[in-house]
A protein has these predicted regions:
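Phosphate- and other anionic-substrate recognition elements at nucleic-acid/protein interfaces
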Residues: 1-157
Length: 157
């Protein structure tokens, strides 16, 4: 069983587990969008390639995709960018014909006894997945993607 966690967004990440154990994690692939407030966007072609290269046709695959919402004080451009990234991730998973489960940050964090503290989240992922590349503070999105993949593994199987 392959489980995948996707933290959408241009600073997000995608993580892969096999039977609950670490396989791979990487930052969300992005491409230059052009001028404007938001300069980058998630690259759908690259994301589909990553999803296919890290899965096998003969194994069941289940994806946990974080359901994102606008937060008070966010600008219109950043809200649109996040929604666009979510849609790109959702379409990429659908293109691969993988089963998908939406999950809110509150739900998967509660499962692991976490709060909104991103460093605690990263520390938890480092303990669970010591082989994963999570050593930098900026790897919190990788940590979250790994924990979502573990959440879907633990709650659906």
């Amino acid at each position: 069983m392959i489980t995948i966690g996707i933290d959408p967004g241009i600073y997000g990440a995608v993580a892969f587990l096999i039977d609950g154990k670490y396989k791979h994690v990487q930052d969300m692939p992005v491409m230059l969008k052009g001028s404007g407030t938001v300069k980058n966007e998630v690259n759908p072609t690259a994301l589909v390639t990553i999803l296919r290269e890290n899965t096998s046709a003969d194994e069941a695959v289940l994806v946990a995709l974080e359901r994102v919402n606008a937060m008070p004080g966010q600008g219109v451009s950043s809200v649109f960018s996040l929604g666009d990234s979510f849609g790109t991730a959702r379409a990429s998973v659908a293109a691969c014909r993988f089963e998908m489960q939406y999950v809110t940050p509150m739900k998967w964090k509660k499962h692991f006894g976490l709060t909104s503290d991103k460093e605690v989240c990263r520390a938890t992922a480092i303990k669970m997945f010591p082989d994963a590349e999570l050593h930098l503070k900026k790897h919190v999105d990788r940590a979250e993607a790994l924990l979502m993949a573990r959440w879907v593994y633990e709650t659906k199987f």
